[in-house]
């Protein structure tokens, strides 16, 4: 049986890192299911960066129970990095204009990082993507897991 790699989208990563996120339970359930299926969860560098940006924004804007940035970075992101679990993908998407064209063709439904995921998947660099983003998952021929 071939092991399947599944890229975790930023919304799934945020759900895993922020216990107050509306997708926290769903993200944990999805991760448990992927583990049960023996799928390998893939953390792409630009998606971890996007997730951290969301967590940083919440740390300054959320008045009740803001995320603990030190814990998120110290117990999760730094550990993932030290263990080699964060995959560098920025260099794989050298087609900046191609990524922009995908974003434009979506009429703005996809942000730059979502368009980059579509490009990486179309080129065979990545496989399925675990995401709760309906616009991303609706892209024609895009393989997603939710």
Regions found by a protein language model. Give the residues of each.
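Metal-dependent nucleic-acid phosphoesterase active-site entry motif
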Residues: 1-24
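PIN-domain endoribonuclease scaffold, especially VapC-family toxins
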Residues: 4-6, 28-42, 46-110, 115, ...
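A generic structural signal for short hydrophobic patches within well-formed alpha-helices
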Residues: 13, 48, 136-137
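Generic structural "secondary-structure junction" signal
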Residues: 15-19, 112-114, 138
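Hydrophobic alpha-helical membrane context
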Residues: 21-23, 62, 145
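Short, polar loop motifs at secondary-structure junctions
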Residues: 131-135
